[in-house]
């Protein structure tokens, strides 16, 4: 496995320079673009890494999975009264569909859906951002996971579109807490800094029927774990989820920090990171690396 991961990174490295680092969040615009790492974590506890797998980066929308897991953990099926689990086919920050569907987001991985989930968590936790940080520390086994407050503040200063979505949902009665407070919590979650190793370990429970191997916790039921993997497969890469399913064939979740996590149910969780994005906001080199890994090992849910 180690040799294969190194070989794949060497093969995809020439793609660096063809994408573009996220620049609509000023604090992310200065990320060194030629970094590349991958980590594979098995249900047997074995870890395989290559490249910059231990370098922390901003996880951004990957955090939406953790928020969803928290909400399901304390509220169960009730959350689906406020949002759906269908693909949107629209950009992740679209307002048009949200207006047309009367303030009920299509799924928890577009921004509007993630804001509803954060609103649900805001009603549950006294300090939602700290609760999230502590949760991912447990999942990853890394007590050093932190929030990059500079990134969180930068996102808050450029919050107009997310605020518009939240106020639009509030106008339809689907947002219950103070919008600015929820936005603060949301951006703090997005600004968590984790490495490929951290994320591969943190997603291990989704490859293991909801059981976290290194903490010994049953995070979700097997049924709930299957459901989250299904939503990741249909909606985890914004409006490029179909292309990812076609090329990689695994449940996945991306973030504009350049990370992509993928799950091989019953076997492995994987995280790849390369900061340059394609036009859909997903790591250009990261998708290719996962495609090659899936092809050469024969991993696919299809």
Curated annotation (Swiss-Prot):
UniProt key word Hydrolase: yes
Q: Which residues bind substrate?
A: 61, 111, 155, 162, 186, 238, 256
Q: Please state the Enzyme Commission number of this protein.
A: 3.5.1.2
According to the lineage, what is the superkingdom? Bacteria
One of this protein's GO BP terms?
glutamine catabolic process
Q: Per its record, what are the GO molecular function terms?
A: glutaminase activity
A UniProt-annotated Pfam family: Glutaminase
Q: Which UniProt keywords apply?
A: Hydrolase
Name the catalysed reactions.
Answer: L-glutamine + H2O = L-glutamate + NH4(+)
Enzyme category, top tier: hydrolase
Task: Please indicate if the UniProt record lists ATP-binding as a keyword.
Answer: no
NCBIfam families with a match to the protein in the record:
Gln_ase, PRK00971.1-1, PRK00971.1-2
Q: Which family does it belong to?
A: Belongs to the glutaminase family.
Among PANTHER family, the record links this protein to:
GLUTAMINASE
Subunit organization: Homotetramer.
Q: What is this protein called?
A: Glutaminase
Name of the gene this protein is made from? glsA
